Design a protein with these regions (language model features):
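Proteins enriched for Cys/Gly/acidic motifs involved in redox and nucleic-acid/cofactor modification
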Residues: 2-207
Length: 207
């Protein structure tokens, strides 16, 4: 869980947001706007299925990916998802990918094949892919052609937009793809769930 002080601060920001107004252009307020929008959409879906929605994040690769996964987890918890230890039981599965080795890509494709079978039994399940593997154009093309059941694809440069991308997917019934080649934007001050209380990572580069 997020620290109480951080949770209280974020909650105050979210409850003050008026979704009847257009989304702000400035960050991080734009992402807080979409967090509140996603939170309401998740709540509605939870009420429909009669239980809290769950998520599972799998991290491949480096410490930077582990740090990014903490951010993804923090945002998911903030919008109403509950962490699930078993991947096949989760309503939202995210793979934070790495391309250090070629077999890393094949490992992700293998996992996706298994998830496709799970998703057929759980139609409202979402599958998201992010990380440096998604920065490869040929990978994205392969996913668009052969893995149409994937819901959300984004890269390393716009992970701060996660709440916005989730809200976009929850409002639609289509694959959402948002890949940036590079960026000069660094957006911090967003929810982050640290896996270990005694250590933390600091990004000194992105991408």
């Amino acid at each position: 869980m997020l620290e109480k002080k951080q949770t209280k601060k974020i909650e105050e920001i979210l409850t003050a947001i008026d979704l009847e107004q257009p989304a702000p252009s400035e960050e991080p307020m734009r992402q807080y706007y979409f967090m509140e929008k996603a939170r309401r959409l998740v709540k509605a879906q939870s009420e429909t299925v009669g239980r809290p929605l769950t998520f599972h994040v799998t991290t491949f690769g480096c410490q930077m990916n582990a740090r990014d996964s903490e951010k993804l987890t923090g945002i998911l918890e903030q919008i109403g998802y509950v962490e699930e230890e078993e991947e096949n039981q989760a309503d939202f599965v995210i793979y934070n990918t790495c391309t250090v080795r070629e077999n890393a890509n094949q490992k992700v494709y293998g996992h996706l094949g298994q998830l496709n079978r799970v998703k057929k039994k759980n139609p409202h399940m979402l599958i998201g892919l992010c990380g440096c593997m998604m920065q490869e154009p040929e990978v994205v093309e392969k996913l668009k052609k052969s893995y149409r059941f994937v819901d959300l694809i984004f890269g390393t440069h716009n992970i701060f937009k996660f709440a916005e991308l989730v809200a976009t997917r929850l409002e639609s019934d289509r694959m959402v793809i948002d890949i940036w080649k590079d960026t000069d934007k660094i957006v911090e001050d967003l929810p982050s769930e640290r896996k270990f209380s005694f250590k933390s990572g600091v990004n000194i580069m992105f991408g």
